[in-house]
Amino acid sequence: MQLTPPEVEK
């Protein structure tokens, strides 16, 4: 599962 910048905000 790759985390993109927007998802890293979680």
From Swiss-Prot:
Highest rank taxon of the organism: Bacteria
UniProt keyword Hydrolase, yes or no: yes
GO MF, any single term: urease activity
Family: Belongs to the urease gamma subunit family.
GO cellular component: cytoplasm
Biological pathway: Nitrogen metabolism; urea degradation; CO(2) and NH(3) from urea (urease route): step 1/1
GO biological process, one term: urea catabolic process
Enzyme Commission number(s) of this protein: 3.5.1.5
Name the record gives this protein: Urease subunit gamma
Protein location: Cytoplasm
Assembly information from the UniProt record: Heterotrimer of UreA (gamma), UreB (beta) and UreC (alpha) subunits. Three heterotrimers associate to form the active enzyme.
Catalytic activity: urea + 2 H2O + H(+) = hydrogencarbonate + 2 NH4(+)
Keyword line: Cytoplasm, Hydrolase
